[in-house]
A protein has these predicted regions:
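Active-site neighborhoods and metal-handling regions in enzymes and metal-associated proteins
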Residues: 1-249
Length: 249
């Protein structure tokens, strides 16, 4: 396994890809209101990414039919943005990415439609997953090892009532959306490859509210919880530094 150190020019292109992605995220978040369909959110992201001269990297990836993955309530990952409309209190996770001049970005956010007052249980869930993400980002610093990232994420989830979906991982990113290394959301300190400044990673805890067992929806894409409880995904892409992950998006 080889984890590349990026050059300044490569990092400039990755930051640009991330800037475009952040613009798409911000536009979608403004439309995360009751009555808006997942398909409409997909169109917003697609328009912004393409109008900026970038390419949506999810579209066509292993045959995926959309620009975003949209996960609603018991969806966990790989959700097709279909005609379902957002309702007050829903938990939504959106994963998206862009390619700028051959270099990738990839990030995910979660939110409760209507905010925490609309559903305090779901607000607590997704903010805990975000806390785990940020703990992993903090551990992604030069001199640490890959296992330190997983340990940091797992420590947050272990101290919560939630469960890691361990079959899904973070990853390296660069010329391809998914590169070495696999970044597990669990692990032991002081294990795995040594982290160096300039490595570019996606840190991506994927968590179930209840039992972590999942299944594939009949549409062949959406991964959903078996017990019908919620799933949640948060993800940042960025660069390893001496003080943790420099978050691009």
């Amino acid at each position: 396994m080889r984890i590349e150190i990026r050059t300044p020019d490569q990092l400039k292109k990755m930051r640009k890809a991330a800037d475009i992605l952040r613009a798409a995220q911000a536009a979608m978040q403004k439309r995360c209101i009751p009555g808006v369909s997942l398909k409409e959110l997909d169109g917003i992201a697609d328009d912004i990414i393409r109008s900026a001269g970038a390419i949506p990297n999810f579209y066509g990836f292993h045959g995926f039919p959309a620009t975003i993955c949209a996960m609603l309530n018991d969806d966990v990952v790989h959700g097709i943005p279909d005609a379902r409309k957002l309702q007050e209190g829903d938990l939504l996770s959106v994963d998206c990415g862009a390619i700028w001049q051959g270099w990738h970005s990839d990030a995910a956010f979660s939110l409760v439609i209507g905010g925490g007052k609309a559903n305090a249980r779901r607000e607590k869930f997704h903010t805990t997953v975000k806390e785990a993400l940020l703990a992993g980002c903090d551990a992604a610093r030069e001199g640490n090892q890959l296992g330190d990232i997983g340990y940091a994420i797992e420590s947050v989830i272990k101290n919560s009532p939630y469960s890691l979906c361990k079959e899904y991982t973070g990853h390296g990113i660069g010329r391809e959306m998914h590169e070495d290394p696999h970044i597990f959301n669990y692990g032991n300190k002081n294990t795995g490859a040594r982290l160096k400044s300039g490595m570019t990673l996606c840190i991506e805890p994927i968590v179930a509210e209840g039992n972590p067992a999942v299944k594939i929806h009949t549409n062949g894409w959406n991964v959903v919880t078996v017990d019908g409880k919620d799933g949640c995904q948060w993800e940042h892409c960025g660069m390893v530094t001496s003080t943790g992950l420099e978050i691009f998006a």
